[in-house]
Amino acid sequence: MIVLIDFTCCGVKICKKQTLELKGGISVKQTWLGLSSFTYPYACGIHPTQRPGRLMTPIQLIEKAQELQVNCVQFSHNMPLDSYSDEELDHIRDYAAAHGIMLENGMRCMTPERLHRYIQISDRMHIPLLRIITDGAGYEPTVEEITSILSDAIPFIEKTGVVLGIENHDRLQAREYADIVEQVDHPQVGLVVDSTNSLSTEETIEEVLKWMAPHCVCFHLKDYAIKRSNSGIGLAIVGACAGTGRLPIPAVLDYLRKHAKRDFSTVLESWMECCATLEETLAQEEAWAKDSVAYVKSLL
């Protein structure tokens, strides 16, 4: 049975389809589409030489979501909210709420001090989800250290209501991320399932889903292609507009909705290669965002 439901999160009313139950009593979770500062990595200044004179701001990212009729925005570490004053954070929060946009936060380098600061920011901005990349420059905590830091943060997240989502990101395997969450064993600590990052540990999306889907609090969707390198020797993994690459997106979304224990956001990211000029890069980035949003909307 499929119904339309309305619900409110952090003052934002969202309407979307929900499949309540399948034959055999399988519960299917809700998901909703979000944009990220990594939907627009070049506009946010990720490239060392192709950098706009003015980088995209949080308000401009919210405006992009409005233009594309997307109700959720996730700020990642390429748009770090700890670089803004309290007054600026309040303005971003109020602007998003006034325009019906739910916000999610993101950080990397999970030291105890940085985690505490980002939980504070999330609480101040009425943000329900903090996505976390544990590692940073020169900082690679062990599984035991990650587990300890998260466990120590439990009183704070219980007080604020913020959910922590640890993202699979390059170094650890999907099984290790699942182990961390199971050891912490708290309903406000889960996983951000990234569709592509675990290629760095030679894990397929099927392996990632097997371990991580039950703990999913957010899905990072980025499609990819594999092609010959420019020299013709070796292979390169590159980004693809959603629905045109190798990621079996409909099957992944279906699996997550059946196996996640809670509702989750589906946040669009991009690994697009840069073009010959900044102008061409930004134009293609914009086109990919529009086409990817249209494709993913057709699946939700």
What function would you assign to each model-found segment?
Residues I2, D6-R124, D254, A283-E286, ...:
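N-terminal pre-domain/capping segments
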Residues T31-S37, V73-F75, L103-M107, L130-I132, ...:
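Hydrophobic faces of well-ordered beta-strands that scaffold small-molecule active sites
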Residues F38-Y40, N78-P80, G106-M110, D135-A137, ...:
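Active-site beta-loop-alpha junctions enriched in small/polar residues
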Residues Y42-I46, G138-E140, C275-E279:
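A short acidic, helix-capping loop that chelates divalent metal ions and anchors anionic groups
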Residues D152, F156-R246:
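Acidic/histidine-rich catalytic cores of soluble enzymes
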Residues G245-H259:
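A short, acidic, amphipathic alpha-helical segment used as a generic capping/interface helix at domain edges
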Residues V238-A240, L268-L278:
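Active-site clefts of carbohydrate-active enzymes
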Residues T19, E88-L191, S200:
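Active-site acidic/histidine proton-transfer and metal-coordination neighborhood
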